[in-house]
Structure formats: C-alpha cells, structure tokens
Amino acid sequence: LHRVPGTHQHLRNGDTLDADWPTDEPTNFDAVVMNPPYSQKYDAKESLLSDPRFAQFRKLPPASKADYAFLLHGFYHLKNTGTMGIVLPHGVLFRGGAEGTIRETLLKKGSIYAVIGLPAGIFFSTGIPTCIVVLKKDNTNRDVLFIDASKEFRKDRAKNFLEPEHIEKIFNAYKNRADVEKYAHLATFDEIEKNDFNLNIPRYVD
C-alpha cells in the first residue's frame, strides 16, 4: 500500500475513537496522515474526558461532529518530533463551543503549523471544500501558515483534480513559509488572537 511493504503494516478493524490503539504495539509515530469521515457522529461518553488523548483539552468535541476527536486521536499518537496532516471540512477552522476551545488550546501550544485550503470536489466521496490541517508538537513558535489553494485545479466534468504543478505550488509555499500574494500568508499568533482564534482562511488570505 503506497509502497509500504506488508511486513511494515499493522491493520486493525474497530472503532478508533472508542478503543484506542493497543498498548502492546508502537503507539507514537514520525508521521500521522488522516482523512477521516467528515462531521460524523460518535459516542462522546463522559469517560473519554479521562482518556489521555482528550484529557488535557478538558472538553470533548460535540457528539454530532467527530472531526476534532479524530484530530486529537492522531495528534496524541504523534512523536514529539513528528508531523501530522489531516483532511477536514472547513468548519473545524471557525466553529465555536467545545471545538473553539480545543482549537484555541492547540494554537496557544503552537501545535497548529499550517492550514491549506483545497479545491472543492477533489474527493469522490464528497463535493464539499476541505482543508489540510498540519500539526507539530515541537513547533518553536506559534505562527500559522495559511495557503489558499482552492482556486487552482483542473476541472473534468463533475470532478476537480490537482495537477503536479498545483501540488508543487502548495509544496513550495509550505516549504518557504512566507507570504505569497493572494495565495499564502504567515500569520503571527497575535494576529490569530485578534481574530478570536478563528482560522477561516479568507481572514488571512484574500
């Protein structure tokens, strides 16, 4: 699978959020890549508040939207020197309540490294716009890079496609971590705080 030999794969069938990864196997990883079901309902039972994946945030994501539950699950299993990328709907960037509290905590810790807006209609399962949230545990500052790649794609009938040149532009902006007019902006923590920890991309890239 994706050039990873079968001997290096460990697959389990179960409810990721209800039953965490077994402790008799490696539980922290250099890279975590996730594309979970968007805004799926889950069992937000009170006992999860003592689960180490969620305990430090003191609030559970709402039962009607498991987006941040998946994010925190993956983030917990990330090594301190690792990088995580998760594809999520844009609502995670600005919704309030418990999600807003979790987002604010992550930002204050410097854990959110970048937000990349993707074109709508690039996944076969949904036509809604999505974004990639990149997280790190060892980030030395609290700046966040915003990339708006939502307008650059090839359209083919009912689907949109990212071509190599589109991916390369995203990669270069991510690597350089600098402003690109109408495409990328490196926002300071003060700027984000003044926006009440709202990460909606048009607030930073217009």
Regions found by a protein language model. Name each.
Residues L1-P26:
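S-adenosyl-L-methionine
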Residues D18-D20, D24-D206:
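A conserved structural/catalytic subdomain of Rossmann-like adenosyl-cofactor enzymes
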